From Swiss-Prot:
Required co-factors: Mg(2+)
Protein name: Bifunctional protein GlmU
Region (Disordered): 457-495
EC number: 2.7.7.23, 2.3.1.157
Cofactor info, note text: Binds 1 Mg(2+) ion per subunit.
Keyword vocabulary terms for this entry: Acyltransferase, Cell shape, Cell wall biogenesis/degradation, Cytoplasm, Magnesium, Metal-binding, Multifunctional enzyme, Nucleotidyltransferase, Peptidoglycan synthesis, Repeat, Transferase
Keyword Magnesium: yes
């Protein structure tokens, strides 16, 4: 499914978006992991138009570099045209056409950069209808319960399109009309250029309205056609943050439903958020409160959630990830993570490994079958296969000026509360005792113990904390011990 070879597309993204009340350009606000402009350009690129032009104005210095990045991502050329003065949508189209050769002949599709749910099928149907009826212009329309802010479609008695009147110029009776302009058009370029040359700014906003082209072409006796879109969300625009949230919710509903229809169990779609670039394998179960963001990849037969957020994380088949926050990490097949686990960028957990409760890992590789069950920080480390890291262990990776790495071999067992002061290497099959501070390398098969014999300082509390609750308690315990009768030796025992 592609556009005909003589089709160019203009994307209007020059408006300031003042109703967003934001320092971020409107078209760069995101939903489902992409900016609004990115959603639109992805949809258009699927149809491979001959030319694709984005018209920028306000904050063009911030938007243009991102358009370049999207062009690289999509593997095609995207031209940028500049509207240096905000003189209306008609003027914006004139600026966009300046990027085309004067002798360009064909069709031009015009759409907006703030319609994030617009899809390739809708655009393909538009151009197919436009060509089938040989229209000078075909405009997409839809019907809204609340049409405030949209241009109204004025029809003739025989239901032909007579004109589009903007909200600010509409009469009270015209504002009652619920069929609105979706802001997506297909034009014959010669007819478009002719009509644009006759636009007037004699209106409430003193701008050149693209919508006035409809009445001009009709008065010329040319064919003006309208194609109604029943699913209004596909052509809904965003002017404020309320509408952004509404469309984000609607897009998420559609993304979640698509995964469900593909064989993924989503227990509670209302509390599950999945970005458009996320992939999930069959028979995976997603529990409530889960967010799968960026380019996260979930294998088949996994269990994810509840209360889990993964951003750009790759999860292998059959893995379990529960109450975990992770980013830019990988989890191997059959591995178990959580609950209350923090995976920072650069974490790689091998197949059948385990990262348990209150474990934080950063920039570390953890081998197949290795377990870090609980209460541990692993930073800048490489751990081999089938090792076990005891509770409350810490990989001490920062010396105050730089990060150092620790290497732990395979089949290693470390006691609780082991401190690995990097850089150190623990050989294969080595052990550490509880409370050990490892400052030097441990040879393979060795037991590292750093603590000396325990030493008890008698009556320390009475001397250092006299009168304290601890001193009083210890005094009572000593007195009770003194009152205990001493058992005489058993008469039958031989001295």
């Amino acid at each position: 499914m592609t556009f005909p070879g003589d089709t160019a597309v203009l994307v209007l993204a020059a408006g300031p978006g003042t109703r967003m009340r934001s320092d971020t350009p409107k078209v760069l606000h995101t939903l489902a992991g992409r900016s609004m402009l990115s959603h639109v350009l992805h949809a258009i690129a699927k149809l491979a138009p001959q030319r694709l032009i984005v018209v920028l104005g306000h904050d063009h210095q911030r938007i243009a570099p991102l358009v370049g990045e999207l062009a690289d991502t999509l593997g095609r050329t995207i031209d940028v045209a500049l509207q240096d003065r905000p003189l209306g949508t008609g003027h914006a189209v004139l600026c966009g056409l300046s990027a085309l050769p004067d002798d360009y002949a064909g069709n031009v599709v015009v759409t907006s950069g703030d319609t994030p749910l617009l899809d390739a099928d809708t655009l393909a149907d538009l151009i197919a209808t436009h060509r089938a009826v040989s229209a000078a212009v075909t405009v997409l329309t839809t019907t809204l319960d609340d049409p405030f802010g949209y241009g109204r479609i004025l029809r003739t008695q025989d239901h032909g399109v007579m004109a589009i009147v903007e909200q600010t110029d509409a009469t009270p009776s015209q504002r009652e009309i619920r069929e609105v302009n979706a802001g997506v058009y297909a034009f014959d370029i010669a007819a478009l250029r002719s009509a644009l040359s006759r636009l007037s700014s004699n209106n409430a906003q003193q701008e050149l309205y693209l919508t006035d082209v409809i009445a001009i072409l009709r008065s010329d006796g040319q064919t003006v056609h309208a194609s109604h879109v029943d699913d209004s969300a596909l052509v809904a625009g965003v002017n404020n943050r309320v509408q952004l949230a509404q469309l984000a919710s609607e897009l998420n509903r559609r993304v979640v439903a698509a995964h469900q229809l593909a064989g993924v169990t989503v227990v509670d779609p209302a509390t599950t958020w999945i970005d458009v670039d996320v992939t999930i394998g069959r028979d995976t179960v997603i529990h409530p409160g889960t967010q799968l963001l960026g380019r996260t990849q979930i294998g088949g037969r996994c269990v994810v959630g509840p209360d889990t957020t993964l951003t750009d994380v790759a999860v292998g088949d059959g893995a379990s990830v529960v109450r975990t926050h992770g980013s830019s990490s990988s989890i191997g097949d059959g591995a178990a993570v959580g609950p209350f686990t923090y995976l920072r960028p650069g974490t790689a957990l091998g197949a059948d490994g385990k990262l348990g409760a209150f474990v934080e890992v950063k920039n570390s590789t953890i081998g197949t079958g290795t377990k870090v069950p609980h209460l541990t920080y692993v930073g800048d480390a490489d751990i081999g296969e089938y090792s076990n890291i005891g509770a409350s262990s810490v990989f001490v990776n920062y010396d105050g000026t730089s990060k150092r790495r620790t290497t732990v071999g395979s089949h290693v067992r470390t006691g609780s509360d082991t401190m690995f002061v990097a850089p150190v290497t623990i050989g294969d099959g080595a052990y550490t005792g509880a409370g050990t501070v490892v400052r030097e390398d441990v040879p393979p098969g060795a037991l590292a113990v750093s603590a000396g014999p325990q030493r008890n300082i008698e009556n320390w509390v009475q001397r250092k904390r006299p009168g304290s609750p601890a001193a009083q308690a210890s005094k009572r315990a000593s007195e009770m011990a003194c009152q205990q009768p001493t058992q005489p030796p058993d008469a039958d025992q031989t001295p």
